[in-house]
Amino acid sequence: MLRRDLLALARLVAVLTMACLLACRPAPPTNGAEQAAEVPADTTANDTAGGDEESHNAVTEVTPGPDVGGTPGERLQPTDLTYEGAFRLPEDFNWGARGLCFYPNGAGGNGSLLVTGFELLFDPAHPGESCYDPNWDCGAYCGEVAIPAPARAADWHDLPEATLLRPLTQFDGDLAATVHREYVHVEDLAYVPRRGSQTQDKLYGSLVVWYAEGAFGEDTFPTVWLANLDGTGAHGMFHIGPHETPFHGRKMGAYLFTVPTWYADQYLGGRTLVTGRCRGTPADGTEPVTTRGGSQGPTLFVFRACDTDDPTGDLDALPMLYYRVSFPGCAGPNVGDPANCDYPDFTMCDEWTGGAFVEGTGRRAILLLGHKGLGNNCYDEPPVNCHDPCSDDHGYHCQPYERQVIFYDVDALGQTALGQHNPWTVLPYTIWRPTEFYLGPTTCWNAGGMAFDRENRRLFMVERGLDDDTNAAVVHVWSL
């Protein structure tokens, strides 16, 4: 049932996407319209053999654009990370693990990982099926695992398996289904110690509506909720920021993480929670270049954690990063030109699923983990055939694809939050393609969540897609 259900969902989204594209033809340029930013070219790549201990493999240093601040001498680099090995997640997390966070109090104070379960909202009485029946009790689930000593093995089956400390538990109180029952992906989660008058620590969850254009048209929607660590006391759904540009549900929810207090105080007015998403569609297609709707590149929006057990209203937020949408100029079906994109070589297939603020040894960066299209924005609809070896479904194809980790200067992003320059002018300074992944950097399967253990300076990344249709997950570990 699982594979058939997901294929049906993929076919449905392709049909709906085509309908949206036909209805959203941009109007001709008008006087005073913003022009897309010039895209800097990449410089040389430093490729080394996969699996090396320092993990400085397949790195591209991005040529800086206009000076937008930042602190080059304090930028984290892939050479600062040492690969420690990996471990398997229990099969409970097959077709899941899109979200990951480190829980410092778990496993008797040794720290554990909280991991999202099946990627769709579902009813345990109907495992592996999307929530198409209105009578089903569907929700978002997560579990807790101990962190075993990571190991290296040629076959991922030989890796140690994490022990399940807490079984998959619903933690959204049926709230996510109020956004949409079928078009939702359960994306990420973040642990936040109790604040203000709260009586318990909190677990924040986030979602994306994977075809928001079909579900909401040009309207925005909420993407975040919170609950107690045991899943009770859920409140939401919350909209990130006010219902005005540049805030929009299409820019939120794919990843969720916290930043250090010192950084929040210096740049973000004390706000510590960050979310974002890459969804390259405009709100309505009436402008040649716009900040309304999605973003043609990853986004970062920081918001304030709640201080009460029963919060209401929109969450107080600031933009740190987003890119303008030039449609169809940048990534229109079969006609888009990357020269019109703010983000270098953006494609409509780009998906970023994990994020973390990583720091140590006097260096720091915000890292995003994702699956990047490297080809043209081909839209497979007769008579066009994109000949994508990863999928023969209708819709966008941007093969080949690769997993990337992109590094952003935290000071440049902080200066954006202070209003010192436009969010779309900040680019990643390094692109890293870890070769430790079992499927390699170039694969049809996307990545999963990312988390950072600040005390022990460990970075965790989820690799999905093992055993093909089983979509098993492995967690890779680096130290700093």
Each PLM stretch: what is its role?
Residues 21-68:
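Ser/Thr-rich, Pro/Gly/Ala-heavy low-complexity intrinsically disordered linkers and tails
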Residues 69-93, 105-175, 229-240, 398-399, ...:
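Beta-propeller domains
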Residues 94-109, 172-204, 208-212, 243-274, ...:
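Structural signature of eukaryotic scaffold interfaces centered on beta-propeller domains
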Residues 119-124, 210-213, 280-281, 373-376, ...:
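Short glycine/acidic-enriched loop and turn motifs that connect beta-strands
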Residues 128-153, 215-239, 288-310, 384-413, ...:
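Beta-propeller blade signature
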Residues 214-372, 377-378:
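Acidic, serine/threonine- and glycine-rich low-complexity intrinsically disordered segments
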Residues 341-441:
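Loop/turn-rich, solvent-exposed surfaces of beta-rich toroidal or solenoidal domains
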Residues 447-480:
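Blade-level signature of beta-propeller repeat domains, shared across WD40, Kelch, NHL, RCC1
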